[in-house]
From Swiss-Prot:
Gene name of this polypeptide: CRRSP16
Ranges of residues in domain Gnk2-homologous: 37-139, 144-247
Family statement drawn from the similarity comment of this UniProt entry: Belongs to the cysteine-rich repeat secretory protein family.
Position of the signal peptide: 1-30
Organism listed in the record: Arabidopsis thaliana (Mouse-ear cress)
Cited InterPro entries: CRR_secretory_protein (IPR050581), GNK2 (IPR002902), GNK2_sf (IPR038408)
Protein name, UniProt field: Putative cysteine-rich repeat secretory protein 16
Pfam families given in the database record: Stress-antifung
Amino acid sequence: MYYSSPTCFVLITIFAVVVTQLIFMRTVSSLNMTNAYLNHKCLANQGKYKPGSWYEKKLQSIIVSIGSGDGFTLGYDMMALGKDSDYVAVTNQCRGDSNGSMCRSCFATAIARVTRCPRYKGAIIWYDQCTLQISPFDTQGKFDKDNDFCMSNKKKMNVDSFGEKWMTFLDNLVGIALKDHLYAAGDTRFGTKKLYGMVQCRLDIYNNSCRECVGHIAVKFQDCWHGKQGARVLGSGCNFRYELYPFVGSNKRGRNLN
């Protein structure tokens, strides 16, 4: 069930489009070492498009436009064409510490892996550094309650109060993110260790929806992350992660929240 609208990501079969994106990848090889593929979902209920169709042509046009634009500086870009049944949109959101060339490279990497969903109108793909979403619907300002997932460390925390501690920390991070481009990273003391955390909402999501999105995935996947030494939960509109080691770029490592 959608909070407002679906997530997405689709397939193009023309390698020329991928090559166009690769022109902008100055550090793809080195980035891929730290830009792990995380997951993807092909949304069959959004239908498929035919080779040479209007949808495919407009999709390719959008991808080329985003790849040659300046949205990577901000770390976010969204472009759409058409209306009603001919509507197609592409949204790229990079992690807050992955702007510029890293964001551009992640976008190109995601486009190059688009064959995971051959000719699907709707799908989404997650990488460590970015999330690419392609949709036949308008998703601006909306998040999807269905297409999300959790990854966690098998090792457990030896502290009963971890859940309460993390939720307080996460709430503090969300508060900071709402004042700073919907992204925040920081650390807090947890016994004898430091707990590092990060939270982000897609830039077109409004403040109240951002907090609701994070709260939704935190509760939905509580059995996955609770008590684990590290975890990340990702959706189409927001995501969070925590570890016992720093994992974001030093320029965006954030503040101590003790």
